[in-house]
From Swiss-Prot:
Function: Catalyzes the synthesis of gamma-glutamylcysteine (gamma-GC), the main low-molecular-weight thiol compound instead of glutathione in halophilic archaea.
Lineage: Archaea, Methanobacteriati, Methanobacteriota, Stenosarchaea group, Halobacteria
This protein's record includes keyword ATP-binding: yes
Pfam families tied to this protein: GCS2
Organism: Haloarcula marismortui (strain ATCC 43049 / DSM 3752 / JCM 8966 / VKM B-1809) (Halobacterium marismortui)
InterPro entries: GCL_type2/YbdK_subfam, GCS2, Gln_synth/guanido_kin_cat_dom, YbdK
Annotated GO biological process: modified amino acid biosynthetic process
Catalysed reaction equations from the record: L-cysteine + L-glutamate + ATP = gamma-L-glutamyl-L-cysteine + ADP + phosphate + H(+)
Record keyword ATP-binding present: yes
Chain's gene name: gshA
Top-level division of the source organism's lineage: Archaea
Protein name: Glutamate--cysteine ligase
Keyword field: ATP-binding, Ligase, Nucleotide-binding
Gene Ontology terms, MF aspect: ATP binding; glutamate-cysteine ligase activity
């Protein structure tokens, strides 16, 4: 990875890219070291060539779709990559599972990757990174101007708590019930340069920040700016990183549809000369906390801060405004966190683990 990107990379509007982090699991559905075998020691299917990588723990693996020029093809690309990963894992004696945190993952019992980048992070960050067994969904949308991308990222912050509430799929961490709907949201926020970013006036301001962080040794590369949304100066995209990982591809595609339509809508508003909203980070953090704690039952602060709105109200507003159906489908289905708790209570931990496996 190049240390920094460039404004010149922002050349395409509306393209898509989907990154997913998964757990490598054994025959019992428990996270296990497997990325060395799957990424380095065996040859993956052609569709995964250059699109497969390991993460901090040897039990976490990441896939990336190719650039998707037509959003209508997102489902085919996503399923093709997922199917190839499952086949590759099974051919080597592993399974693949997805959630924001795996309920059976105990970080002290799991191996960290040996890649120099991760060794540097572990040494620099220490405990918060040592325990970071999280897995998320990252959606990239191409933006054709760097200043526009920064403006869009600023505006997207308001919508992130709704995404997190609908995606909440990590009630368990280190083997116990946290009482949260998305414990991943809190575990990951313990790292530096995470959570809700502040606003940037333009791309120059963002680039200056990125450069200062590198020059001062705060980060080793731009990829270590792990905010919930960021202009990706390498890909020329706006990257949304808020949602928990999901086993069901239909849930993933609902978020992809929503993020894409949001970015396109905001880009048009920028082009129309709309002024951005100066939202206090404290209120954004409050809404994120409510999403972490309550998931789909959350009451989120309204834009004018005069009242709260239920997730159901916000889903109705966003679905009607953007013409997206997937949000309603997400809302009316049992949430990932609710399903995990129900399965553990009714059928036990092995049924819970099995429910997270991709097939």
């Amino acid at each position: 990875m190049d240390a920094t990107g460039s404004a010149e990379h922002f050349t395409r509007m509306g393209t898509l890219g989907i990154e997913e982090e998964f757990y490598v699991v054994d025959e019992f559905g428990r996270p296990t070291s497997g990325t060395d075998e799957l990424v380095y020691e065996t040859e993956p299917p052609a569709v995964l060539d250059g699109r497969l990588d390991h993460e901090l723990f040897k039990c976490v693996i990441e896939t990336q779709t190719p650039r998707i020029d037509d959003p209508a093809n997102a489902g085919d690309h996503l399923r093709s990559v997922r199917d190839a990963l499952v086949d590759h894992a099974e051919a080597n004696g592993f399974g693949i599972a997805a959630a924001g945190l795996h309920p059976l993952a105990k970080w002290r019992e799991l191996e960290h990757a040996e890649k120099p980048r991760y060794k540097s992070q572990l040494d620099r960050i220490q405990y918060p990174q040592h325990r970071n067994t999280t897995a998320g969904l990252h959606v990239h949308v191409g933006v054709d101007d760097a200043d526009k991308a920064v403006w869009v990222a600023n505006e997207l912050r308001w919508h992130l708590p709704l995404m997190l509430a609908l995606s909440a799929n990590s009630p368990y961490w280190n083997g116990f019930d946290t009482g949260l709907q998305s414990a991943r949201g809190k575990i990951f926020e313990a790292l530096p340069n995470t959570g809700m970013p502040t606003t940037f006036d333009d791309y120059d301001a963002f680039e200056t920040y990125e450069q200062r962080m590198l020059e001062t040794g705060s980060i080793d590369d731009r990829g270590e700016l792990w905010f919930d949304v960021r202009p990706h100066s390498g890909h020329g995209t706006v990257e949304v990183r808020a949602p928990d990982g999901q086993a069901d591809p239909d849930r993933v595609l609902a978020f992809v549809e929503y993020v894409h339509e949001l970015v396109v809508d905001l880009a048009e508003r920028y082009e129309d000369g709309e002024s951005g909203r100066r939202l206090r980070r404290e209120f954004l953090d409050e809404n994120k906390w409510r999403a972490i704690r309550h998931g789909q039952s959350a009451e989120l602060l309204s834009r004018d801060l005069s009242t709260t709105r239920s997730v159901e109200e916000l889903v109705e507003i966003e679905s009607d405004r953007l013409g997206v159906d997937g949000l309603w489908e997400l809302y009316h289905r049992e949430s990932g966190a609710e399903r995990q708790r129900r399965l553990r209570s009714e059928e036990g931990v092995m049924a819970l683990a099995d429910s997270l496996r991709l097939s």
